[in-house]
């Protein structure tokens, strides 16, 4: 768990410094999370630099105005405090601004992947919410409404 928190801290620091890549020490779980980030388009990619030391280089992704797609990465479930959600309640979670990583009996999945899998099952599956990633994808119309609200 500490390795993963170090990876999240390195990504956040790299994004604040506008770095193109950061180097971290990886593990099986780190590779799994990074491949999910890459599939969702949150990072450009990652590459194993040194196999014996498990060093991984993460290539960060920015918008054209050099703002990052990632806003925050929260580790929700820790050793003593775990957050579980039932399969029936998955439909109520808003995936527009946040990306949820849920650990189920099928492994670590994003919320949309779990919803698709639940459509095929008789009884919907829930799981443990491990991580929440806040994404900087704000609709321009919503930004205008927020500005107008603050001007009044």
Swiss-Prot record:
Pfam family, one: Ribosomal_S8
GO molecular function per UniProt: structural constituent of ribosome
Subcellular location: Mitochondrion
InterPro entries in the cross-refs: Ribosomal_uS8, Ribosomal_uS8_sf
Keyword tags: Mitochondrion, Ribonucleoprotein, Ribosomal protein
Keyword field contains Transport: no
Domain of life: Eukaryota
Main location: mitochondrion
GO aspect biological process, one term: translation
Any one of the GO CC terms: ribonucleoprotein complex
Record's keyword annotation contains Transmembrane helix: no
Similarity-based family: Belongs to the universal ribosomal protein uS8 family.
Protein name: Small ribosomal subunit protein uS8m
Organism name: Dictyostelium discoideum
Name of the coding gene: mrps8
């Amino acid at each position: 768990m500490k390795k993963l928190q170090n990876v999240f801290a390195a990504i956040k620091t790299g994004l604040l410094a506008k770095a193109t890549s950061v180097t971290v020490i990886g593990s099986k779980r780190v590779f799994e999370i990074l491949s999910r980030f890459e599939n969702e388009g949150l990072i450009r990619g990652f590459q194993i630099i040194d196999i014996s030391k498990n060093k991984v280089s993460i290539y960060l992704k920015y918008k054209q105005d050099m703002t990052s797609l990632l806003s925050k990465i929260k580790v929700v479930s820790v050793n003593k405090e775990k957050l579980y959600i039932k399969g029936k309640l998955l439909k109520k979670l808003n995936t527009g601004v946040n990306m949820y990583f849920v650990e189920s009996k099928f492994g670590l999945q994003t919320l949309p992947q779990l919803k698709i899998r639940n459509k095929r099952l008789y009884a919907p599956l829930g799981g443990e919410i491990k991580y929440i990633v806040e994404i900087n994808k704000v609709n321009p119309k919503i930004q205008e409404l927020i500005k107008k609200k603050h001007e009044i």
